[in-house]
Amino acid sequence: MSLTTAEQLRACHVRRWHIVQVAREQTLAEHSFAVAVIAGSLAAAMRWTGLMQNNLQLKLLQWSLSHDIIEVRTGDTPTPFKRVLEQAGGKGVFEKAEDLVDSDYAGAYRQIRGTDIEVIVKLADQIEAIYFLQDNGIGAHAIRVLDGLREILSKMVNDIEKDYPHLNVREGVRKVCQDIEIHGGWL
């Protein structure tokens, strides 16, 4: 069943970061917008050739804005719990659950899986999490989470460089992180 327009608009109210202390709430809509901005900047910094094709530009924008839209029905499932679900139910259990919640969303994800678009949006999603928590995280737990997010981004860059050598991943991520003042020698 597809999400209705009214359900999609609830992204303005779905909250993120509910297991990390933050100075202010972030909504799914704010996160999705920031991911779209970062994904566009990242694609340009990587010199992604898809930017020369209107249909791929549109797909990048659409997926950036909707990559987490299922959360208007599920809420923002914390990443640590996603890992527990995978341990309990096996690899792909979270995707199977999302398919039950909204098969159209799951179908959209299957269409971009393994593409440059998926890679760019995943990197943008990770960068956005670091960006938000760097500015809004409070306390020792938030610092540990932020350190973990940076480690994950570094590993993602290393892995993606191997699997997608045509993308200038490290250069692109460095440029975007520098531009939005995410600091660290972890890349």
For every predicted segment, state its role.
Residues M1-I19:
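Short alpha-helical hairpin
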Residues V37-A43, L58-T77, K122:
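Active-site alpha-helical segments that house and flank conserved acidic catalytic motifs
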Residues D159-L187:
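Charged phosphate-binding loop/patch that engages nucleotide di/tri-phosphates or the phosphate backbone
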Residues L58-Q62, D102-R144:
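Histidine/acidic-rich helix-loop-helix segments that form or flank divalent-metal centers
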